[in-house]
């Protein structure tokens, strides 16, 4: 019973690309972290990227990080570039007074840079103090053509400094990665530079020295990142690739996507390696899906059956037992004639839910459903919920968590097996009344891993968050950073961003 993950060749990793000293190493990370009020709510994904970043820094590489955050509206690069061209018109000022006024608004160090290019002897005395006075007066006395030449040169070589507003194409404050840069600096215990425009960072990157780190602004501020138009994606990929001597993908959470930063850059550079996190993710999933210690139990929860159908079908070819919980269980219970009250179910998939347990039986896979429920007439109750004594849910009530009988059954399954895959919470764990089931199973899986070495993989953003909140994460073999990426692996698919990386020789 094997899945197609077995066919993934072993990829080059961080340790296969030495030496990196003095090289610009572009690392695609997954810093798509939950935020609120400008703060980081959960830094798990940031911490997961530290080993790769630290290795490059310690070896003297120049570390350039790129990521997305959330779903900003974004702008097209060509549109943004055209707007930038319009904003450059101030250098075409018609008279000396206009050019001088423009010069007077620049910073002291920028003025010093411009005057240093001048052929006029009298400007030299003003350069001893880059923040001193007198530079504007010197500039005002320069010949008109000299002023024009100097401003055009500064415009060309210091575009980001001259027009800082050009670095905000597509900018939305709530999706900015700048707070992530602050958190990363804290975790690395070193300064992290921030590039305000991911497609206009050439000048900033050129200033970086060996061992330094820069995080660029949100890739999705440009719609090119995930554009359906390959030409637009590759335009962005070529710009990003121009920053790099070496490309590393350490963003497992987005490895299922065909986007500029994930598949485009390695195609442009014709090289790419897996970061330590990516390598670890692929290794664990490949092991547990293709050659796991047996018996193997899969616990699949979540809200909708339609999101997990292919996963469930594929797992029948690899697991020994399959527990189906969370919101998707109610369609299965409905298909078997149980009363589910007002619990959400998907009528269109009732035939699938009827057929899956039979298919499992034919493959010697035990398919297990909830035996009882914690439920309520409202999804946000002020009083204690009702716990049923059977799989039936009373009219007017909705199931929001598994009950004690179900917890006992899953506990028995976990203690019997040698490997566990868990994807999807088993209840509305964000609310205290409905967290007990999910947290109880987290405790059982953790204890089994600690006591008898059970291989345990927890995948999916909500499941990883639940595991962290339960306080039981320490003994889990692997908590995946991937949501849809881990689902696609469970479905037996090869991830697009992994396929384009170099195979290990």
Swiss-Prot record:
UniProt-listed Enzyme Commission number(s): 2.7.2.3
Binding annotation for Mg(2+): 303, 307, 462
PROSITE patterns: PGLYCERATE_KINASE
Keyword Iron-sulfur: no
Gene Ontology CC: cytosol; glycosome
Residues engaged in binding AMP: 303-304, 308, 327, 399, 430
Keyword Nucleotide-binding set for record: yes
Compartments, record wording: Glycosome
One Gene Ontology term from the biological process aspect of the record: glycolytic process
Residues noted as binding (2R)-3-phosphoglycerate in the record, renumbered to the chain: 29-32, 45, 67-68, 70-71, 219-220, 256-257, 304
Cofactor: Mg(2+)
Residues noted as binding ADP in the record, renumbered to the chain: 302-303, 308, 326, 399, 423, 429-430, 462-463
InterPro entries, alphabetized: Pgk_euglenozoa (IPR027250), Phosphoglycerate_kinase (IPR001576), Phosphoglycerate_kinase_CS (IPR015911), Phosphoglycerate_kinase_N (IPR015824), Phosphoglycerate_kinase_sf (IPR036043)
SUPFAM superfamilies named in the record: Phosphoglycerate kinase (SSF53748)
UniProt binding sites for ATP: 303, 308, 327, 399, 430, 462-463
GO molecular function: ADP binding; ATP binding; metal ion binding; phosphoglycerate kinase activity
Assembly with partners or alone: Monomer.
Family statement drawn from the similarity comment of this UniProt entry: Belongs to the phosphoglycerate kinase family.
Full protein name: Phosphoglycerate kinase, glycosomal
Species annotation: Crithidia fasciculata
